[in-house]
UniProtKB/Swiss-Prot annotation:
Its main location: cytoplasm. Its EC number is 2.7.4.25. GO terms for cellular component: cytosol. This is Cytidylate kinase. The gene is cmk. Belongs to the cytidylate kinase family. Type 1 subfamily. The lineage of its organism: Bacteria, Bacillati, Bacillota, Bacilli, Bacillales. It comes from Bacillus cereus (strain ATCC 10987 / NRS 248).
Length: 225
């Protein structure tokens, strides 16, 4: 396994991309890049600065002054905004419900994609998001598109929220996830879309271990070539 490849994992909100991507990266001793966390960090910074997130010009001022870094913690990846650990605060419902609005802006996405490509240029990365296989890493050797029903994804997010001590309403989550799907797939710039050469993986009735196993066997096939 000397060959260091790029692995792109795309899919809608709460499909389990990050959880699976982290495990795959760990198994391969690869770098995991959570592109969603990058957009969340920008969203958090904009909200903190009371910026109008519909205003692209104002958002770009925030982006220019934001340095995002990833560090491997004991059991998880830590996200830093200008040196401050924001790993937890970027996962609050307040940020979650606004991140698709921030991510729809062309200039914001262009800058984020530039940074993501820079992080991945040497290979040996597992990157997850909405447009990795289609736009960020179109030449990735492995492309996965993860799917799950809205109900299943809402259940997962509900459990995640409860475990983190956030207030959580399952029915409201179903509505919010459906709304994010709509925003993500209908936006003009890099919409949520399966790459033509991506393998579709419906995770609705699969455990994390089963999904990881499927991806690892796909990766093994690439290494064997």
């Amino acid at each position: 396994m000397d060959k260091r490849i790029s692995i792109a994992i795309d899919g809608p909100a709460a499909a389990g991309k990050s959880t699976v991507a982290k495990v795959v990266a760990k198994k391969l001793s690869y770098v995991y890049i959570d592109t969603g966390a990058m957009y969340r960090t920008i969203t958090y910074a904009a909200l903190e600065q009371k910026v109008d997130i519909e205003n692209e010009e104002q958002l770009m001022e925030v982006v220019k002054n934001v340095k995002i870094e990833f560090q491997q913690g004991e059991n998880t990846q830590l996200v830093f905004l200008n040196g401050q650990d924001v790993s937890e605060v970027i996962r609050t419902p307040e940020v979650t419900n606004r991140v698709s609005i921030v991510a729809k802006h062309r200039l914001v996405r262009e800058e984020m994609v530039r940074r993501q490509q820079e992080l991945a240029e040497k290979g040996g990365v597992v990157m997850d998001g909405r447009d990795i296989g289609t736009h960020v890493l179109p030449d990735a050797e492995v492309k996965i598109f993860m799917l799950a029903s809205v109900e299943e994804r809402a259940e997962r997010r509900h459990l995640e929220n409860m475990n983190k001590g956030f207030d959580s309403n399952l029915e409201q989550l179903k509505e919010e996830i459906a709304q994010r799907d709509k925003l993500d797939s209908e936006r003009e710039v890099s919409p949520l879309k399966k790459a033509d050469d991506a393998l579709e993986l419906d995770t609705t009735s699969l455990s994390i271990e089963e999904v990881v196993q499927k991806i690892m066997s796909i990766v093994s096939g690439v290494f064997a070539k």
